[in-house]
Amino acid sequence: MRTHFCGLINETLIGHTVTLAGWTDVARNLGGVCFIDLRDHEGIVQITVDSRAIDQNNSELFRVASGLSYEDVLQVEGVVHARHAVNDKIKTGKVEVIATKIKILNKAAPLPFHAHENPGEDIRLKYRYLDLRRPEMQRMQRTRIKLVQALRRHLDMHGFQDIETPILTKATPEGARDFLVPARMHPGEFYALPQSPQLFKQILMVAGFDRYYQIARCFRDEALRADRQLEFTQLDMEFAFVSERDVQDFVEEMIRRVFKEVAGIELDTTFPRMTWKEAMRRFGSDKPDMRINLELIDVAALVADSTFTPFTNAVAHPNGRVAALRIPRGAVLSRKQIDEYAAYTAKYGATGLAYAKLAPTGEITSPIAKFFSEDAFAALLSHIGAEKGDIVFFGAGNYNKVSDFMGALRLKAGKDFALITADWRPLWVTDFPMFEWDEEAQRYVALHHPFTAPAAINDIDELRTHARTALSRGYDMVLNGNEIGGGSIRIHRPEMQRAVFELLGITEDEARAKFGFLLDALNYGAPPHGGIAFGIDRIAALIAGTESIRDVIPFPKTTGAQCLMTDAPSPISEEQLSEIHVITKKLTP
């Protein structure tokens, strides 16, 4: 139906007859001349129909051209000419096609929005097929496609094997709710959609495949937000006989190469490394945005002699923290704006936010200054590095809570005061705690997942004794404040895996029921192994320059977990429910 793509017509084709096919991007009738911008996936070219240059037998051509509407689907035959008025805004702007034939392949109904408009997200998602025609959406989808292609090429070149793992699998606790699928042939039993291929890729290492990868679809029934979907895509990888550094060095090279190939982005030759403990202390986050040159400063020693109760209580508590955050030029904040910052940090657990403003004149305004001697308060501000025109915020309380809300404040201040530099700052975060203590459940939970190996502990009794302080062999790759990949060295000894299950409150019977197949596999000569999984959606969004992963997913769900285009989820007939042995009941509000 076509000989060339619209966006690839250029000066080398002048004088040649071409056949094109695409959509009517714009159609303009200027009296005796019609100009049509014809669009396909490669771009736009101008089609010209001049009634004055057409003999009487071809007057039908002008009639067709003058009656075109947005998004009509056309086949056009014509001759390539040099344009009199060059359009430097498009790559075909030096040429045009003088049409000799136009065939309407399909008329478009009146549009809910035009391809060059940017309507509300609900409308975009309802008419996703129109939304995806927009040049910006085409660009973002192509970025994703190029990313996946580049990753595959790199892994294939290095001997990795692309192996599929099951979509219908067993429900296992991995941190989020499972999506369950009734098993028609086994009444009362259910499959689960995989939250990740974690256990299968470990079993592939036991099976001797050594280097595995998969572009894997994963499913988690959890609350949605801009960077989270019910179904998402991972680059899943696993290696046998590796250390943490082996995995990290390989994927560093891969990410550097792929970012340069896909988007021309140059990343650091070596990614810096930081322990989880240091990241939380300095930045209040296990995925710090290193583009923001602000750090939390511990000031417990300098406030211990004050009479400000929130500070002294935190200092006295073994798990307390008093941290300060200096914001350059922040003294411009009004009292109302400071209150808004306090309300913002309250969402992250803050019960109050103290501050000190240093006016350009040197005058200090602070509601907590009265709880210090003049010299002590001056020494505190000097230690923090506060200068004229700055504001300093203080947080006090439980160490983890203070880290969380002061870390959130750091990010907000970075955005509000334009302190985020326009570069790319990758980082490895390592040495995560093996476990967290869940006060509500009164038990340990795994910080990464239950299959992560402990660091520097080979003895089970030692792990039991030091569970609260044990570190894991987990690692995350962080880029500009986004965790783009997470992995670990796995447990490969069955007795250690049983001990970890026990510490997590998983009984032996429960472990057999849920993970018996893994424990059995580890019994038969499992090699040391480890790996990592990268979030394709998140990386594509970063490269494409969008804050929402919905923009790089062709058919995403809304934050209400719906597909507005297909109207999913939708009711199922009683007949279908009966076939899968499911009975539903209405819940009273």
Swiss-Prot record:
Provide the Gene Ontology terms for cellular component.
cytoplasm
Region Aspartate: start-end pairs: 198-201
Identify the residues that bind L-aspartate.
Answer: E174, R220, H448, R490
Which Pfam families has this protein been placed in?
GAD, tRNA-synt_2, tRNA_anti-codon
Q: Which EC number applies?
A: 6.1.1.12
Question: Known Gene3D superfamilies for this protein?
Answer: Bira Bifunctional Protein, Domain 2, GAD-like domain, Nucleic acid-binding proteins
Q: What is its main location?
A: cytoplasm
Give the Gene Ontology MF terms in alphabetical order: aspartate-tRNA ligase activity; ATP binding; nucleic acid binding
**Purpose:** Catalyzes the attachment of L-aspartate to tRNA(Asp) in a two-step reaction: L-aspartate is first activated by ATP to form Asp-AMP and then transferred to the acceptor end of tRNA(Asp).
Family the UniProt entry places it in: Belongs to the class-II aminoacyl-tRNA synthetase family. Type 1 subfamily.
Name this protein carries in UniProt: Aspartate--tRNA ligase
Q: Which organism is it from?
A: Xylella fastidiosa (strain Temecula1 / ATCC 700964)
Name the gene: aspS
